[in-house]
């Protein structure tokens, strides 16, 4: 099957630096049609993407991975987005319940290595299970989050599941996102107002103090060695070969070889 490399996307990523999130979302729908889905953990940035998809009437499906140990506020946010924004949100689940996993493997999230295994089983694998239905996933990473995400591109090949990851909010600053949320009264997970800078499983997520890094509340019990869950390609160590396989017509549309798909 034809291959798409990260190097193939260099020129397009430079062009996309000048595009708005709305333009990038519209491009995503035109290029990938029903083979693109947004992924959201029901955090603030994900809600912004969901609001844009709804406002633009793009009909893009949203995938939410319910690890089985999510905060109730997160599940309530998902339900509100479905109800009030009219979104098609599909909830994905791990193969095992947390109870069954613990019985088989022990409490994985108590060690760095175990945390990586736990996140892979409960977050990454459910997404990989459906990845064959899609050519691209829309995320909500922003360079303003810092860390490894400081340099996240708009388009990135995801070798984990052979899809293109699209980050339409990559250039959006904290102030710009706050302004968008206020202006459009975006539905936001209420945990953010309780001091949670980032939100995931209730076992491994805590609020942060004003002077702490945004991700200090994730796996706090493991210190600075655990920061990311691994579901986003920008958070993983880039392999020697950043290449994925896609149908040739899809690659042609991505790279603008058909005039209708150039923006």
Positions of the model-derived regions?
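Nucleotide-activated chemistry modules centered on ATP-dependent adenylation/adenylyltransferase
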Residues: 1-263
